[in-house]
Structures are given as C-alpha cells and as structure tokens.
Amino acid sequence: MTKRILNVAEKPSAAKEIAAILSNKRATVREGFSKYNKLWDFKYNILNFNDCEMTFTSVTGHLMEIDVVEQFKPWASCDPIQLFDAPIRKTVPSDKEPLKKTLEREIKKADILILWLDCDREGENIAFEVLEVCKNAKKKFEFYRAHFSAIIPREIDRACKNLAKPNEKDSIAVDTRMEIDLRIGAAFTRFQTLYLKKFKIISNSDNQPKTTTPANGNILNNSNNNSSGKEIISYGPCQFPTLGFVVERYFRIVNFKPEDFWHLSVVHEKMDTSSGKMIPVTFSWCRNRLFDYTAAFILYEKCLDNTEATVVDVTSKESRYRPVPLTTIELQKAASKKLRISSVQTMQYAEELYTKGLISYPRTETDSFQAGTDLKGLIGNQASNPEWGAYASRLINNNQFVYPKSGKNNDNSHPPIHPTSSATGLSGNLKKIYDFITRRFLACCSEESVFANTTVTIDIQGERFSETGTMVLKLGYLEVYPFDKRNDKLIPTYQKGERFTPKRIDLTKGTTVAPHYITEAELLTAMDNNKIGTDATMATHIQTIQDRFYVKKNESNQFVPSNLGVSLVASYELMGFEFSKPNLRAAIEADVDKISRGQKTKQEVLLSTIEKYKQLYQLANQNINCFDRSFREYYEPADPKGGEFRVLVSQFSRCGKCNGKMQYKSDQNPEAPKRILFCPQCIDTFDLPKNGDISQLVTSMGVPQNCPICQYQVLSVRNPINDKSYTICPKCRNSPPDPIHKKPFHCFQCTFNCNLATGNKQQQQQQQQQQQQTNYNRNNNNNNTNSARPITTRTTRTTTQHRTFTASNNNFNNNNRNSDRNNNNFIF
C-alpha cells in the first residue's frame, strides 16, 4: 500500500526549495487555503517505503499564539496585577486559519507527518503547534522530525535518512518563556501606559518636550511618534535591559565632566637603513598623562636639563592571528560595524540566503566545525567565483588549506555559518552579506597573518618613553579578508644602549573626552555577555526599542535614547528596581535553559518567576510617584481625559503637597464646562463643582484658610442666584479622608475638628430631630394634641435646615440626595 506523507516547513520559501531538492525539480504545485502557502506533490523513497506520495507545504512562523482569555483582554476589565494569574490559552489566530484548514485537510489523507521546521528551540515549538493542529484533526498517524543545517542536497538527504522524534523539552521551554513574557509584559505595559496618560508623550511644533544636552550631542525628542496621546508604552523583560544599556551609556555622557591633563612626548628623526629615508619617531610617555600641571611641568623641566636619550630596551616579537568560524552574534556585530547594516536587516538577508540554499542555517552559537566536515568541498564550490575563486583554488590545490581554529562555543545543533553554494547575480546588501560570510569562511581555512612588533623604550632623566613599530611579515588570511585592518608602522632600527639627542621634547595639554553613544556592535556584545535574548532574538529586541521610539540611531549609526526611553529607565531606577539591568532577564534565560535540559519543570519556573515579578509590581505601584519625578523633566502634563483645557487663573490656590500655586482651568464645553485645579509641579488634578462662583477662602486677617487634614487651600463656592455659599477642600472633595464617604465630599459633611467642618453639629441636630420625632410619636399615642403642634413646627423647621446645609455621617446617601434636591442650582 502506498504511503502518503505530509511534510511541513517553517516558511514557503523553505518548502519550495526542499521540495525541489527531493523531487529533482519535478514536483507539481497546487493551491492551499492560504494563497501564500502552496503545496508540492511528488514521489519519493523514504522510511524504507518506495514511491511514497509526498506533499510538501509550510506555515509562516508560529502557527499559534498565547493570550489571556477574553474577559481579561479589555484594559478596563481588571487591575493589571491580575494578569499575573489570569487564565491563558494558546490558539490559532484568525489570520492563520487558512493554514490550519490546509493542515487539517492534508493530514486526514496522510499516514505520516514529517516536520521540517527550523532546527532550533523556536522551530521545535512550532513543530509541536503543527502537531497539535494535526492531532485535533486526526487521532492516529506517525510523526517525525527532520534535522538539517542547510538547504542543500547533501544536508536534506542526510535529514531524510536520520528522522527522529521532536524534542518536547525544547518546546516546553519556549512555551514557558512566552508565558512569562506575556504575563510580565501585559501587566507592566498596562500599568505604565495607564498611569502615564497624565503626560503628553507626543511631540509637535507647539509643544516640544524638554531636552537635556549631553557633552557631545542632543538627546533625541520622541518626535517620530505620531500618536494621538493613546499610544501604548510597552514593557518587555528583554527590551527593557536592552534599553538599559543604551540609557546607561547616555548617562555616562551627560554626567561626564571633562578634565585637563598633560603628557610628554619625545620626537626623534633617524635614518632607516632599508629605505635610506629619515623617519620621524614619536616616543610616548610611559606615565601616559598627569592631571596635575605643576607635577607635569617639573618633570618636563627635568628632561630639558639633560636631553640626551638612552635606549634601555628593544623587544621584538611575532604575533599571529586568523579568525574563528562565524556565529550569529559575530555576523551581526561585523555587519553593523563594517558594512553598516543593522542586525535585524542582517538576519533578514541571511534568512533569504539560507532559503536559497546559499549559506548554512544563520542562527547558531557554534564557532567550531565538527571533525569530518567536508571543508575542502565547500571551498571548491567557490573556485568559479570571479572575485575570490583563484584564492579558493590555491587553498585546495597548493596545500595552503589549514583546518579552522576551534572557538569556545558549541550549541550542538548547527555548524558555524558558512557558504554552501557559489552565488552569482546577487546585488546590494544581500551580496554584501554573502560576500562577508564567504570571505570569513575562506579566512578561517587560511594560514595565519604574521606581524613583527618591535618596541623601543628610551630613558631621559629617569623618565621612560616608548614607541612600537609593526610590519606585516605574511599576509595569510588578510589576502582574502579585507575587513581586518593592516596597521603597518615602520620605525628605524635602534640598539640597546644607543644614545641620541631628540629633535624636541613636548609638554602637551589635553582634555578628557566623553564616551560616544553605544554602537549596535557594542550593544550586541553587552546583550550577549549578559544573556539578554538569544542569537535568534537579540536583533528583534534591538529593533523593538526603536519601534517603540525609546531609542533612535544618530548620523554616526549610534543609539541615542529618546526622552521617553530615559524617563522610563530613570523612573524604575528611582524605585530601586533593576528592570533596566540584565540580572532579572538573565535569570529567566538560565531557568528556560534548565527546562530544555530537564533540570527544571515549567511549573517550577513559572511559579518562582511570576511571584518575583508580582512582588515587584506591587512595589512599583506603591512607588508610582517616581514616574512623576522622571517624566516631568521632559514632558508637559496631559489634559485630563483628553480634553483641551484653558487656564483661567495661572496661580490660583495653594497645593498642600508642594506648597506651590495651582492653576484654575476650564475645558471648552459651552454648555457645562468642566473645571479643575491643576498643580504643574506635582502633576495632580482635582475636579471642581461645575456650577457656582469659586474663590479662595481667606481668614478675616487676609490669610489663606488651609484644610487641617491635607493642607490644601480651602475654596468657597457661591450660588449667584441665592447668594448662599459652601466650602470645599479640593483634595478632600476628590479623595474623602474617611473611606465611608463618597466623592464629592464637602466641608459641611466633615466631622474633623475644624471651624469649617459642620458635620458634628449637624449630627447633633439630627439626633435632636430624631428625639423630637420620638416624643411626638409618643404624644400622639397619648392623644396629647396641645403639645404636638409646637413639636411639629420645630421638626419641620429643623428638617428644612438639615436638608439645605448638611448630610449626616450616618445617613450620607439619603441626606445627600436631600441636599441635592434643595440646592438644585449646584451640581457637586
């Protein structure tokens, strides 16, 4: 019986290339439910079966995504802290439904499933996503995993002969990391986005955020963010440490204080016997520099007393070097530094070269080739290249081939990045990346370059000076690899004990210079050294902080943080957290690695990590005012609820928190304008009554009357129709001092020991009223009509007074309705 086999690759281009290799380019193509993911059908002998009916298709990266369940998706649905424990589910999103339908249809016709996903942890996770979809459609079928490092016939054939089972531990490790990132990212993103709505985190011609000027450039405004004030200010456990490296360098720049220093140098001219020319030699001071001018000048004068120089040492040594094989991180660093191609673009070009079968898998930490790798065969593939073909031929035909050096890293999954086929017709950055990878591979298989380094040390009056000359003795790998510099620096021959009088001795003043902004190569090195992300994700994290407008590249291709990026990092540092430091993320990555190795379970890692971040969230919530301290340096406050407010009085009443003057503002609503008090120093806003004339309350001596509870200046609200007034504390009105009260809260409801607080007096009046009502009822029962009339009159008068001015603490809701009914000219 003929076996039907469904094969699934990670990308359409990979499916097309692998199908072409297995079918010898004789596959027939048909459409799937997704117009981007076609299917190729052909016959092939595999798994000891002849003429199997093979169908090859693909997904496009992850087939499924995780998210919290529907009830927690609206931002107003819960406190962000609940997202640490909210139920989550992994589902196929709507845009991947066509892929799901194709897999379901094809697996029902298949006996075997072969998973051709990329051979890394992420690919393993995608393999299990494909497997889950297929198992939901069909209960029983065999499944295998194909492992390959390049899309070339030799590797694909080897993969077919060595099919294995997918690695579930690697997949679980990815699921764990994804859940951690989802919970932490969602909680802190909502937390900081919702709170920071109080600031205008946008830039326009009328309102440019404040900037700080470092020693050698301007910090970038967040000017590329064309948001409407509703942008998301995201947090990610990887993106924040990445941002932290950029901001840390920035703070080193802005905090840098230049210092003057002085250094000595000796200039001598001597005949070079080999060239017959006079060569100037500048000997540098072995002390390097002094920051004390007097001390430097004394030593300078000492040297001038007797300028004769004596050669005290001449050392010569050879240095040899050639590069180790290429890893993903080294490719990204070199491309950024030498080719000026960003890390994320580099990986896109490398992926394209890989799917074309031109290079090996571009995501690898390995910098050593396994024994038995046919390196000469790979070099032979390049013999026809017009640029380096002659060099490649010499390597294998003239016995110049040298087995590559071994580095220190091996991920046991993929070999170092190397060319797998000769390429012609490439152009632009794609060609640059291919050329670099190929030249690096040829350099690894070449002889070392040899340099002669000669250092001459002289003495003048006890002060030592030295100079080093360098000469290339053998080009070696440099012949094919122009990306390493050749630093020839000739000096004439000196003999130990030789004496001479220098041409001059100089005392030179210099000034220390601030460090430069961090480059992409330096950022990648910092991330790699601190285990932030993986070789497959580092470029993405760097791109993310650019997409979020936290950083931007300047004209020198260096990363400069925006006001937003600096403010976020500074806020969490004020809280005492190390969110921008690598420690927390490195611990997560280490735990995820342990899941892959079977040393920890998913539940163990989730429990410890989520609990740790939940505690940090609670502490952040308690110290949320740190955002105010950082953000008000760069941003103006936003108008509450997105409205446009105009200032009625710029310095109206006193703030009880900072003791400064608050602004009295109103929005533009002509029918019922909303009025607020706003403190520009504390970034606090207080709602005011919509009706009535509002003025500051002062004592008979003209002194502002402050609330004894919160120290905010009390305001008077007057009804212009009946000329009646009441008083409010703006703070207490919006945040009642006693939780049993609801806002708006007024002085006539307050029971504090204050001459404005009449709540106690009204309580007494209410108690008297209740006692009178009791007496009245008792008298009625006794048919005592003569004494009932005055009680009725007094009760009516007391009740009317009560409804007009107060609501008791014990009956707030009902009495407040009475108050509203009698004071219908006000809306509190």
UniProtKB/Swiss-Prot annotation:
Its EC number is 5.6.2.1. PROSITE patterns: TOPO_IA_1, TOPO_IA_2, TOPRIM. One of its GO terms (biological process) is DNA topological change. The keyword Hydrolase does not apply. The keyword Cytoplasm does not apply. It is an enzyme of class 5 (isomerase). One of its GO terms (cellular component) is RecQ family helicase-topoisomerase III complex. Residues 4-149 form the Toprim domain. Coiled coil: none annotated. It catalyses: ATP-independent breakage of single-stranded DNA, followed by passage and rejoining. It holds the Pfam family Toprim. GO terms for molecular function: DNA binding; DNA topoisomerase type I (single strand cut, ATP-independent) activity. Releases the supercoiling and torsional tension of DNA introduced during the DNA replication and transcription by transiently cleaving and rejoining one strand of the DNA duplex. Introduces a single-strand break via transesterification at a target site in duplex DNA. The scissile phosphodiester is attacked by the catalytic tyrosine of the enzyme, resulting in the formation of a DNA-(5'-phosphotyrosyl)-enzyme intermediate and the expulsion of a 3'-OH DNA strand. The free DNA strand than undergoes passage around the unbroken strand thus removing DNA supercoils. The active site is at residue 361. This is DNA topoisomerase 3. Keywords: DNA-binding, Isomerase, Topoisomerase. Residues 167-617 form the Topo IA-type catalytic domain. PANTHER family: DNA TOPOISOMERASE 3-ALPHA, PROKARYOTIC DNA TOPOISOMERASE. Belongs to the type IA topoisomerase family. InterPro entries: Topo_IA, Topo_IA_2, Topo_IA_AS, Topo_IA_cen, Topo_IA_cen_sub1, Topo_IA_cen_sub2, Topo_IA_cen_sub3, Topo_IA_core_domain. Residues 763-828 are annotated as: Disordered. It comes from Dictyostelium discoideum (Social amoeba).
